Amino acid sequence: MRGGRPHNEDTHQAGTIEIPAFAKRQPVSLTRANKQLQENGAASESGDPQVFYFGVFDGHGGAQCSEFLRDRLHTYLEESASKFHMESSLQDPKESDDGHKQLLDLQRTLVNSWKDTVGGYFRRFRPEYFSIFKPTSSTDEQPTAVNSIHATLMYAFLHADMDFTAAQASKHTPSLPSSTDDPVLSDRPLNDNDVLSSPARPASQNFSNVLKRPIGGHTRFQGGSTASIALISTPTPTPFWNPASPATIVTAHCGDTRILLCRVSDGKAVPLTTNHHPSTPVEATRLRRFAATFVTDSFGEERILGLANTRSFGDISSKRIGVSAEPEIRLTHMDPSEYSFLVLISDGVTASLEDQEIVDIVKEAKTPESASKELATFATEVAGIRSDNATAIVVRLGGWERRVEGGGGSIGTKEVREWKKVQAEDPRASRQ
């Protein structure tokens, strides 16, 4: 929904993706017991159960970057999984020293591309490659599979951002007549084309088979986009929305778009992402070593070079100080009917509503589709003329039919939401 803005710079995507399964393997006894359910499900070309993909992208400065992510990010994931020879968590792992070396070489090459092309923050980037073999925790039962999807997501995000950033750096700024007057072009390394996906031609002419146009348009795009994606994998072909099916969710996130779960037992919102803002302790620690440009705007919000987000795709002028697309990755195992739904929202929704208010609005809707519309509409109405683009995706999970059971349903935030609507409709309140 466009809201009070002249253009809608938000985009979204949903569908299936061709990568191996990463779900937690079921015990043999349960697998046999659920054999009848499995026969009714769907499998991917590899024989694994299908992996589902959902994403929300909030563009700023234009929609070029968010449209690129909508159309291409899932293909970067598929290509990365293929390059990494990602193994299914449902099959026995294959050990190969040559394969391990190949993965490390791919990762090291990508990091070096960032160091050579952008420099700054990335010259201090550690490690040179991503950890894909070390367990993420002491209780990790399947370290290879877990770390494989982790490394695949990290590589895909940084590779997509490298292609987008390099493509913009090779173009002219419309207001500048030639490359000699362009600080980005004149400061470009001689081997810049070596890191492009089509090095034989300029990045501005690096057409994709999907977009059928140069990445980011014909002139340099200096804006960017946040990204929050969720991948859902099941151990059997039984779909994740079946009440009897367990599932695993992996989220990868940059910026201030958000992903929430609603727990059936108590009706509480469970955030799977954190906002990447300068005021966030982790982000402040990460960036203060490289940037002394934190400022506070008139609303008391900290910004870095005018940006509210410390992680994003694009934003080429801020890459050197660490505004990167390194994703925050989280893995969540779901028992059957443990959660009722998943929500992906842009900051046009979260600017007006708290996490619990968001899930309570969804509880009152009859279908996930109507819930998405009601979320965007409510957020836009409450924000009034100051409303931002608002986008919401609601995904039905196994506990959908029980979404109002725990925590008293949606009554906990009902008064607050009604008060916000009254305030929004009061003309005197809008003038304050």
State what each model feature region is.
Residues M1-Y53, G59-Q432:
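PP2C/PPM-type serine/threonine phosphatase catalytic core
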